[in-house]
């Protein structure tokens, strides 16, 4: 396979069910960058809200890790997925979690337009966007909403959404065709 074919195959993981982590994170990314209220509430000094895709990798991170050294106060929405524990006597379904860690710089913790703590506002907007939806094929619902403190500079909130979803029962089409089954 050529380098371009390999790249195309890797990019295709964003569109197909073969890898739940990549597929779910792509849906989350699209929902976040297309929600102007979330983008504006992140209050970025260096990015233009009219170019929300630029927020990916800067304020929207598909993992829980914030950059240790910064010149300006920043607010983050970190998201991740987790799939575990097959329900008892059911090998077809598994439990899935979508985890949001909202981390806000203490220097700009209050949203000046609303007077609401920024991490609470972002949590409410994320809940509105994802709770009780079927965005991932099966309904997700919020099961945990807890405050967190990262250090003396950041505070935040962790949201966990859960669902029961099919347990990797889809095989990549090329594998099915090559093996004949």
Describe the function of each predicted region.
Residues 116-171:
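Acidic-leaning, charged glycine-interspersed low-complexity segments
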Residues 95-111:
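Short acidic, glycine/tyrosine-flanked loop/strand segments centered on an H-E-D-like triad
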Residues 16, 109-117:
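Short, flexible/disordered intra-domain loops and linkers
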């Amino acid at each position: 396979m050529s380098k371009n074919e390999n790249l195309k195959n890797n990019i295709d993981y964003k569109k197909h069910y073969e890898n739940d982590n990549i597929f779910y994170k792509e849906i989350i990314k699209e929902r976040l960058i297309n929600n102007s209220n979330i983008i504006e509430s992140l209050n970025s000094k260096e990015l233009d809200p009219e170019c929300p895709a630029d927020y990916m990798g800067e304020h929207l991170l598909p993992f829980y890790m914030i950059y240790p050294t910064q010149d300006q106060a920043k607010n983050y929405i970190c998201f991740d997925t987790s799939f575990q524990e097959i329900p008892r006597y059911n090998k077809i379904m598994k439990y899935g979690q979508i985890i949001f860690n909202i981390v806000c710089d203490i220097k700009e913790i209050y949203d000046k337009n609303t007077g609401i703590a920024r991490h609470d506002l972002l949590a409410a907007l994320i809940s509105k966007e994802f709770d009780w939806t079927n965005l991932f094929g099966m309904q997700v619902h919020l099961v945990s909403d807890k405050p967190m403190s990262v250090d003396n500079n950041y505070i935040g909130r962790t949201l966990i959404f859960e669902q029961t979803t099919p347990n990797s029962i889809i095989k990549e089409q090329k594998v099915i065709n090559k093996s004949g089954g």
